[in-house]
Amino acid sequence: MQIDLPESVKEILNKFQKAGFEIYIVGGAVRDILMGRPTNDWDFTTNATPEEILKVVPGGLYNNEFGTVFTPNPDNPENPHEITTYRKEEGYLDYRHPDKITWGKSLEEDLARREATISAMALGPKYEIIDPYCGQEDLKSKIFRAVGNPNERYSEDALRMMRAIRISAQLGFTIEEKTLEAIKKNAALINKIAKERVKEEFFKLLVSPYPREGMLLLRNSNLLQEILPELEKCFGVEQKSPGRHHIYDVGEHLLISLKNCKSTDPLTRFATLIHDIGKPQTYKKLDSGTITFYNHEMVSTKIAENIAERLKFSNKEKEKLITLVRWHQFTVDERQTDSAIRRFIKNVGLENIPDMLSLRIGDRLGGGARETSWRLEEFKKRLLEVQKQPFSIKDLKIDGNDVMKVLSIKPGPK
């Protein structure tokens, strides 16, 4: 296959070769190249020490204990190139970071510490592929497989379990059986990881091409119970009853709603995923067979607030999440007055209207309904019309002084 590398990447390979060092491209970039996917994330590994790396690329930055030097990436300034010395890692008392790092002696030694076969490949200066763990075969078979003993990989760094789910959801891969069993066995270790890092991986999963499948993997791997036990409780809670359009239980409804959410904003997708999370607590089946969830949006809002605090959402993220969940039951009725529309806009916030509509579309499709209706389309038109009207005195284009000028009225005494 033809491999076309950016000039800045070629320059790094050439500089290290001329200086007499080994140098390889590693990580996700190699995987993306082999899959024909674009990438701006370039990682390198070398037998040069950090001090020697800085001599080869004097503009680099080195201020960490992992042997990584950061150099400018002209194609993506916010994501610098990373050049790391071959290394070995030992001991992971915090289930995240190695207790001891020593410089490795070979590329093979360095690749052995990688988490997955599809990430344990290297591309050399002559475009040769080094693949000691048959990562290319797993790429072709669309399989995510841990390197070596998966129990060891996940007890070393528990966040790798979330990454396994996230990468599989991004690529549409299946997790190999022993790897999945190891995640199930070690799922509780995810609680050792900082909540901010868990949220970061969770958000990446939500905006992946296969978010519903990713959520099912989280559930099947026991990770969902550890991260979002409130969502796990939604599965098996029936909704279909006389006069109710829902054809899925609450959990499946939420996953299908997520799948059909048009927004690419991870926070909006998260709100879509949990908008009915209060239904298990408000479930009631009447003698007629009708199922009700009265005030579930209020209960869902409180649960969403607790989740946001637990997963360390910022105040801004928390506010938006609560808003979307609280008002997701908004009424769409052709008889609504302009005042009612204005109240809706005020409650939701003008900036959140597009995301609220995305949630509604996902919610409709997640219940077996069509994407839209004539009432929803009419509601969208009304939103545009009402937005042109002033909401309060301060929104008026003219004020009292303008009126006095037009009517030639002199100002009264101060």
Residues of each region from the PLM?
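Catalytic cores of the polymerase beta-like nucleotidyltransferase superfamily
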Residues: 1-414
